[in-house]
A protein has these predicted regions:
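Lipid interaction determinants
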Residues: 20-142
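Bacterial N-terminal signal peptides that target proteins for export
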Residues: 1-8
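C-terminal motif of bacterial Sec signal peptides marking the signal peptidase cleavage site
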Residues: 14-18
C-alpha cells in the first residue's frame, strides 16, 4: 500500500495556525509555532487510517507561521505494515496563508492546493478527507 500522508492541510498539507491571544479578531497576530495536538480527538501518536494490514499513524507535526503570511510545516508519519514493517515518512511543505476573521486558508507553494480551517482560542481546527478517510486535526500555539 502506498504511504498514506497525514495531510491535514492540503497541498502536501499546508499547515495551520492559531491566534496569539484568545481573540479571533482580524488584527490579532497568528504568527508563531504550532504543534499538532490531536487527530480525530486522539493525542499523538494517533492512528489515522487502517486498511487491511496497513496502519497510518501521525507521530508529530510542527507548523511555523510568519508575520508576512508564509508557512513551513514538518510532519512525521509512519506506515505500519504486516508485510514490510514500519516505515517512517517525513514531509516538509511550505506556502502562504490568508486570514479572514476566524477562518484561515493555507495554499501549498508546490501543488497550489489549499485548505481552510477555523481559528479559536490559540488553536486551529482543520477537517479534510484523506484517502477516503475523514481527518480532523487541531494545532495549538506554543
Amino acid at each position: 500500500m502506498k504511504a498514506i500522508s497525514i495531510t491535514l492541510l492540503v497541498g502536501a498539507m499546508a499547515a495551520a495556525a492559531a491566534c496569539s491571544s484568545s481573540s479571533t479578531s482580524p488584527s490579532a497576530s497568528i504568527a508563531g509555532t504550532y504543534v499538532l495536538s490531536s487527530v480525530n480527538g486522539e493525542s499523538l501518536p494517533a492512528i489515522v487510517t487502517k486498511t487491511g494490514d496497513d496502519t497510518a499513524v501521525v507521530v508529530a507535526d510542527t507548523l511555523a507561521l510568519t508575520a508576512n503570511n508564509t508557512y513551513t510545516r514538518h510532519a512525521v508519519d509512519t506506515l505500519r505494515s504486516e508485510v514490510s514493517g514500519v516505515t517512517l515518512y517525513s514531509h516538509v511543505s511550505s506556502g502562504t496563508y490568508a486570514r479572514s476573521g476566524s477562518s484561515i486558508t493555507l495554499t501549498d507553494a508546490v501543488t497550489d492546493s489549499s485548505a481552510t480551517g477555523t481559528i479559536a482560542n490559540n488553536a486551529i481546527t482543520i477537517s479534510s478527507v484523506e484517502n477516503g478517510f475523514a481527518v480532523t486535526g487541531v494545532f495549538t500555539k506554543q
